[in-house]
């Protein structure tokens, strides 16, 4: 177990609190469905800076400037009681209350303890992330963003947790890029003002009214079970090329039409389910988090801030997934993503309002063996975040919202590579690591 000493915890507020036009952000059905979901956790590992640079002070000061631009992260979740129909409504109050900044030290941990050659993730790593067990609805009293800077023996880990109703992966990494730029050069003159996603669901009344009975009692916090194991699987550029060639060989697509993300997702899905101990006739699902920004009609700004994610799903049987091959599995994912339309998103939002079923934890407690959940994206430029003492040497996902089959995709540190941070049941992982067919496509 690693020893972590917490040096300080403070609230960092925006440098300039200008309330004009920033008072309130209404929440869509896509946001409100996450009311009881854990804060999303991610982290970047850096080389250790020279202490003479006073980097902790620089990080804190530049965070204040970054929050002036990304002001929703400095707000709080607010609840309004609608007594006329016994419902409640939620919105983001951009009041400048601030984000949490934690400074910690762990002299007993080195970079090699975290970046193990076999890709395994130590159990103690969870204490390097803030907001463990905190859910979106807790944003009524908790900061919407928390950051923990942990000094290690030979490195620094910046772990963070954020309220997923406020932002998605694209937005949090855009925030990090802005924060790192301000920290490294001290300037913000050329940075663009924040463009919010807006209320992109046409014909819907806001704020949305939710029955009080659905919000009175938060489900108990679900800590990461010790039965789950984490592993980072590294796919080299050659591995990915081989997977895409195999897809082409089975279904005849040209290579440039084969998505690297979808090919690796299909490979992981087939391999994990093959070792999950399910009967051939049982159903299996692959969930994929889809960015709606450019899929809506009209499309949103590519850089707009907010949570703009739709969870799409492919369903088949265990037997069919195994028998039909990698190319077929890829095609199911590809066809599902290509077939999504603006009408699908509109119908989902309208149905959610009519028959509210708030997601309680992750994507459902029953999905421990029969599903995989593909989240994040190798498109996110995680390795470009230089705070002034060098670029990151690794990126990791925290333990929140973890069920077996959760797959968090990151770009690899080498160009063209993909790292998959996987959360699996121990018996599934043991079988996967003995699977030659799986390992020969994984570096």
UniProtKB/Swiss-Prot annotation:
Transmembrane segments: none annotated. It is an enzyme of class 2 (transferase). Pfam families: Transferase. Its EC number is 2.3.1.-. Keywords: Acyltransferase, Transferase. The active site is at residues 164, 386. Coiled coil: none annotated. GO terms for molecular function: acyltransferase activity. Gene3D superfamilies: Chloramphenicol acetyltransferase-like domain. Signal peptide: none annotated. Belongs to the plant acyltransferase family. PANTHER family: FAMILY REGULATORY PROTEIN, PUTATIVE (AFU_ORTHOLOGUE AFUA_3G14730)-RELATED, HXXXD-TYPE ACYL-TRANSFERASE FAMILY PROTEIN. This is Uncharacterized acetyltransferase At3g50280.
